[in-house]
Swiss-Prot record:
Topology versus the membrane: Multi-pass membrane protein
Pfam families assigned to the protein according to its UniProt record, in alphabetical order: CASP_dom
Annotated localization: Cell membrane
Segments crossing the lipid bilayer: 26-46, 79-99, 115-135, 161-181
Keywords for the protein's UniProt record, in alphabetical order: Cell membrane, Membrane, Transmembrane, Transmembrane helix
Name of the protein in its database record: CASP-like protein 1B1
UniProt topological domain (Cytoplasmic) ranges: 1-25, 100-114, 182-195
Ranges facing Extracellular side: 47-78, 136-160
Amino acid sequence: MDLEKGKKPSEQAAACRIMQVKDKLITLQPVVRACVFLATAVAAVIMGLNKQSYTTVVAIVGTRPVTQTFTAKFKDTPAFVFFVIANAIASGYNLMVLVTRRILQRRAQSLSVHLLDMVILTLLATGSATAASMAQLGKNGNLHARWNPICDKFGSFCNHGGIALMSSFIGVALMLALNLLSAAANSPRSNVTGQ
């Protein structure tokens, strides 16, 4: 019967295996997307709540010390603000796609989601990279510009920022994996098996 229609049995078996692989890739996507949502939401919340105060004696007048309180907040650095916004957008987007994934099953919407995933990956990667750059500056300073490191005085602020950065970079890696899964699931049949 298959030979009458012009298909060989091995081609049918290969097509069946390809569909099984695509089905597995499609069922894996919501799990990875949920992990991306959690990682980016944790990063946004931790950095958004990151604040520490440090009080030091700046002078002694007579016998009374004069103290000054310094506060480190994420809002003081535009890179950290961008980091929080990028992670919040990424977590909101992934939550929206998780909620509406039944509607987005058709191929046209699936390709739109794939393109938006690439945009979100780019936004998330740039937000994480800019925040990592500022975190490195806060930790090590810049001796040429005479910017002293601040992590020796604001240890908790720097530790929370580091946790947020790690969570965000995990989100970037998972978002990249999600893009690869989506590309493989949306690819033509010949590209999935490497034929």
